[in-house]
Amino acid sequence: FGFFAKILIAPAFCTQNSVATELIAMAEQLGAMAYIDAPIGTTYAQALAGRGPAGTINFNTSSDRVRLCYPHVKVYDPVLNAERLEPLSARAAGLRAKVDLDKGFWWSSSNQELAGVIGVERQLSAMIDDPQSEVDLLNEQGITTVFSSYGSGFRLWGNRTAAWPT
């Protein structure tokens, strides 16, 4: 149709370095945004350390075409009649598309409710007035995360790309 995708995801597969590298290359070539998850089971400390040159996860990039996502989220699976983990990238990319359509591409997807999310893989400290909370420290390293506070539901938290803080 003459259009190229502007939101690129490969949920679950993007935790592999080879897939993450190709997503980044495609995003750079197309002027798109790639959403990349930390591997399931990644700790808060590993997510932060993954941003550095000695990182052991797939977060070692400084591309302004990448949104790094941590942690996985819990969703209800009606087939299993139970909750299951899902990569945050799928929900974050869907929310980005929804915000683009509803409010415009210039509107932030941060602090917008993540529909269908009922929990997170790992609890993170989150206080709206505490810059030392885990969600804010993740944002300082260019990692998009999930914030839940004051009965507002689970919200995507963070506007920065992987280019931050370089």
Which residues make up each language-model segment?
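A glycine- and small-residue-enriched flexible loop/hinge signal that marks low-structured segments
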Residues: 1-166
